[in-house]
Amino acid sequence: MRFSCGRVQHHFLFLLLCATTLSCGRGGSAESRLGLGGIDVRGNPNNVLSAIVGVQLTNAATVRVEYSSDPAQDAGSTPDFEVKNSRMDVPVLGLMPESNYSLQVVATGTDGTVVKGDPISFQTGSLPNDIPSFVVVQTGDVQPGYTMLGCIVFAPQNPAVIVDQTGRVVWYRENPRTVSDFQKQPDGTYTVAVNNSDLALYSYFLSQYQQYDNLGNLLRTWSATGGWLTDDHELRLLPNGDALLLAFKQKMMDLTAIGGRPDAIVVGNLLQRLAPSGDVQFQWDAFDHLPVAGISAPVDIRGAYVDWTHANAIDVTSDGNYLLSIRDLSQVIKIDSTSGAVLWKLGGFNSDFEFIGDSWNGFSMQHGVRQLPNGNILLFDNGDGHEPPQSRAVEYQLDFVNRRATLAWEYRAPRSLYAAAMGFAQRLENGNTLIAYGFAQPVRVQEVNASGQVVWDLRSTSGTFAVYRAFRIASLY
């Protein structure tokens, strides 16, 4: 029997199996027997590629759902979920569109016994028309997992999507507003920056961050505190529940000394660490720590509005301080997480390091800084100021004694993949690097090995849009 997406099928079943029947002689009282019943399946209004299986459990430690499609194109299982309540909803993610599935609940008891429910049917729906499509060419060993893409499409519905290694969309969450930064946070939730206004400040969208569970249900929102406008470039959730995010600050300044206007509106950034309540735990103000004279070519300083800092990435270092990528200064800085002092500057105006072994003598208009486990710094160098412009992923080893930044690794993309804006580089567990080329057209994301060979190459096959970043994750759950 087939059921359309969203229709609820009640499969009332109650199985009470004595533990001895599955555990080779283990005894068990009636009160300790494993049981399941009241099974139903329903569609997910946020995502037709998923289902929600409800089940009533007795004396169960874990529960999962095994699934297979008909015809046999797709089969798998959810993880084993810890049973915390007698009634559980189990998410089933990453299904194929327009497919009939057989779903089976599998429960494991506290004593190791196992019981399975009867198979139930579920029919997935059709993907929305505005979900982009992709193709992949794989030519080598890749890091297993899924790839997250924040798609900036400027359409009635703007999707954050996740694709598998073949390029098939396996998860999405649409939004009527433009989206950008899309990440899976350490607690397993997803966050996405959403434009929440029809207005813009200079070239920025005024945004908020939405936090979802893996079914795309909205859990909460995050915004800058203190009346400041929220920047859409990055949100990082910390293990203690705090959030790091960026905000905008405007200040009228006389820039005639550097070729600007006497009444320029200069746009800078704040970095805030917020408690879950929204209370500010830490705030850093670029105007208090950096000179406006450090603005980097090709930024135009002659207009009424001057996009001064354009911070676009945050990372927490191994010693608990903060890295901040400041695009319009072509600079990465390290900030003391207690005092706010700038501990060092890499690149740009008054850099504390000399570049060694880098024929481009540093990076230009970069995105996505990260500290690697070995202490090195990895970033996506957009290369707007290189001659000619060219993008790359680049890694530097920092020598704090001699103040040198030595090129440890780079991958210079073909000039056809030059990304004037956006982009990201992520070092993967297998040593490869995932590179998103931002505004390059058509959309491209590549996995490159340590030797500089492209082993996985994704490109869009539908329309003109941009991908702000890409992240490889191990699981949808």
Spans of features found by a protein language model:
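Short, amphipathic alpha-helical segments
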Residues: 27-28, 190
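C-terminal motif of bacterial Sec signal peptides marking the signal peptidase cleavage site
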Residues: 20-23
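Short, surface-exposed linear motifs at loops/turns and structural transition points
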Residues: 28-127
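Bacterial N-terminal signal peptides that target proteins for export
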Residues: 1-13
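Histidine-/acidic-rich catalytic cores in large beta-rich domains
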Residues: 106-477
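Sec-dependent N-terminal signal peptides of Gram-positive bacterial secreted proteins and lipoproteins
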Residues: 16-17
